[in-house]
From Swiss-Prot:
Phosphorylation at Ser-365 by SGK1 inhibits its activity. Phosphorylation at Thr-753 by MAPK1. Dephosphorylation of Ser-365 by the SHOC2-MRAS-PP1c (SMP) complex consisting of SHOC2, GTP-bound M-Ras/MRAS and the catalytic subunit of protein phosphatase 1 (PPP1CA, PPP1CB or PPP1CC); this relieves inactivation and stimulates kinase activity. Keywords: Acetylation, Allosteric enzyme, ATP-binding, Cardiomyopathy, Cell membrane, Chromosomal rearrangement, Cytoplasm, Deafness, Disease variant, Ectodermal dysplasia, Intellectual disability, Isopeptide bond, Kinase, Membrane, Metal-binding, Methylation, Nucleotide-binding, Nucleus, Phosphoprotein, Proto-oncogene, Serine/threonine-protein kinase, Transferase, Ubl conjugation, Zinc, Zinc-finger. The modification N-acetylalanine is found at A2. The gene is BRAF. The modification Phosphoserine is found at S151, S333, S365, S399, S446, S447, S729, S750. Changing V600E: In CRC; also found in sarcoma, metastatic melanoma, ovarian serous carcinoma, pilocytic astrocytoma; somatic mutation; most common mutation; constitutive and elevated kinase activity; efficiently induces cell transformation; suppression of mutation in melanoma causes growth arrest and promotes apoptosis; loss of regulation by PMRT5. SMART domains: C1, RBD, S_TKc. The active site is at D576 (proton acceptor). It is linked to Defects in BRAF are found in a wide range of cancers. Colorectal cancer: A complex disease characterized by malignant lesions arising from the inner wall of the large intestine (the colon) and the rectum. Genetic alterations are often associated with progression from premalignant lesion (adenoma) to invasive adenocarcinoma. Risk factors for cancer of the colon and rectum include colon polyps, long-standing ulcerative colitis, and genetic family history. Changing G469V: In a colorectal adenocarcinoma sample; somatic mutation. In quiescent cells, maintained in an inactive state via an intramolecular interaction between the protein kinase and N-terminal domains. Following mitogen-mediated cell activation, binds via its RGB domain to active HRAS (GTP-bound) which releases the inhibitory intramolecular interaction between the two domains. This allows the MAP2K1-mediated dimerization of KSR1 or KSR2, and BRAF which activates BRAF. It comes from Homo sapiens (Human). It is found in: Nucleus; Cytoplasm; Cell membrane. This is Serine/threonine-protein kinase B-raf.
Amino acid sequence: MAALSGGGGGGAEPGQALFNGDMEPEAGAGAGAAASSAADPAIPEEVWNIKQMIKLTQEHIEALLDKFGGEHNPPSIYLEAYEEYTSKLDALQQREQQLLESLGNGTDFSVSSSASMDTVTSSSSSSLSVLPSSLSVFQNPTDVARSNPKSPQKPIVRVFLPNKQRTVVPARCGVTVRDSLKKALMMRGLIPECCAVYRIQDGEKKPIGWDTDISWLTGEELHVEVLENVPLTTHNFVRKTFFTLAFCDFCRKLLFQGFRCQTCGYKFHQRCSTEVPLMCVNYDQLDLLFVSKFFEHHPIPQEEASLAETALTSGSSPSAPASDSIGPQILTSPSPSKSIPIPQPFRPADEDHRNQFGQRDRSSSAPNVHINTIEPVNIDDLIRDQGFRGDGGSTTGLSATPPASLPGSLTNVKALQKSPGPQRERKSSSSSEDRNRMKTLGRRDSSDDWEIPDGQITVGQRIGSGSFGTVYKGKWHGDVAVKMLNVTAPTPQQLQAFKNEVGVLRKTRHVNILLFMGYSTKPQLAIVTQWCEGSSLYHHLHIIETKFEMIKLIDIARQTAQGMDYLHAKSIIHRDLKSNNIFLHEDLTVKIGDFGLATVKSRWSGSHQFEQLSGSILWMAPEVIRMQDKNPYSFQSDVYAFGIVLYELMTGQLPYSNINNRDQIIFMVGRGYLSPDLSKVRSNCPKAMKRLMAECLKKKRDERPLFPQILASIELLARSLPKIHRSASEPSLNRAGFQTEDFSLYACASPKTPIQAGGYGAFPVH
């Protein structure tokens, strides 16, 4: 403290120089007055000691300002010390004033005290001038003491809200502006994302961030304004009678006759009209606004942008995958899991499904098993709340026990009404146990539910093998197909990537897709799918040489295109589409298997993934064979493989059957010198199918159509084929399954319907 300068006065005695070694003339004058006052025997010694403590505290405050005053974000220990010294100074000054008033000679000492305080003001003005404007929390302790010496003001911030409203929030250290104003905005039907906050500085409004520490703005005035492009309007209320089950968005009670806003959908009773939020926000347009802003700040990669542009020019666009499977992907539809925080009391219940009876379209005969008297709970929010909530603050407990023992079930609600005292105690302890259990378990990956433990699958005979694994017939709650993947000792990066892709595969449900049933990691990575009783398309065409009619071949092509269109709509690239992976049931239903799994179909070196040329080269697109891009696989590469499958269907042969050199095929196809010979197609092949085959086998990737267009072309072709219609005069009994001998039971004679033709001879003919 030897460097402390600009003190509030040191005194004439040698002991007083200890507090301030560099005494200025003004400070000396003030100290001289204090010393003369102290020399007066009528002044109690306590007052003199308090004045010395005041001076010492002021010097400490000045030292803190000199050391940390110029920093924009000072350390927290400095803020704590500054607050401690200012509080101590205020208490000493109050004590001094009380003593002077009780002695009746407060005038003389007020002058000396004022001189001392003025010294602090003048000496620390340079330190205060270098403070940033955002550090207005460092107020001059002199001004605080003079304005209200007996009751120091709490740090607050005045906020002017939209629609000529205002509020006051406390300025707590470590709390952001967003957290401080969130409740006030929610009460008015607003969220921080649709507003901007400004501070008044030098008569001008300057925007600040929502994540700014509110303690830096102590004593200032903030203005919150709604963004210009936010669709904010006034309510458009109409009287409405709700014939379907509806609830008031304020009191959550049954609503039959009331009012509804045509813009935001807010419903309420007439008695609840005073609690309706003043602001009307069209959340549908607001969601689109936030999504557009997201794409502005998170641009789509160039490869995906070109892919989307190609899809749009071809008249279709691949849909995005499900939300829980993509994580950071860009092309995801925002509807499944909206990241936009919507205020609970003001979002219409039938729009965001938070009401107690979620309304949804369903069959009138289907039982409404969704009816529940407990509001749906987001598990992530519940775990977070359970982590910070005390034992007595829990309102709804959730345990890992069966539904019958849930604390929020109907049974417990009735028991709570009968005996509120004991039930409240049991509920508190139950929630405490659940909270501890949730902390122990942590966050659980949903893909773990699809992992089949080791030993539950009985592996049977070997069916076949390929580039990526070996297929076995197995038993797991029935017949299944088990594909043991050629990945030995997977690294953590491989295993995590494998689980991420499994998270996508487990959501595939389509009539032309093999049903994914689970996966196994021990003793090695394996995929479990449904068992297909039929044979593969390759076996039908090239092994047993089944002779299909043209109408059947076109239907097989249609089903294959339909299944691939579904996979691409889920943003799943097959990467290995061929006739070996297309299975036919006995009724000629197509099932596509071995799709996705880019992790397995790649070469790994440590934690880095590289694409490799593996699999069946006959179905590989030229860009895949060249391997010039980091990831040559795309929707169009699957289209090329589908074109080869069409070639197999329409010719009954494999392409390049006249070339026996594998390396020659790789070189010529990759360079674009070799294409399948379309002159070998069957004579009865429609010209439209031949044209479609040629388009799918284009050498340039961007010139190939996508599966929505391919499927539409095949369906149009199937409808245009001539068909033999059933004769309208054919008896319908034969179609019903009656046999010829069944009619003998009813062969009884009738005068109205004679059976034997000879009977007509008995009647005379005139």
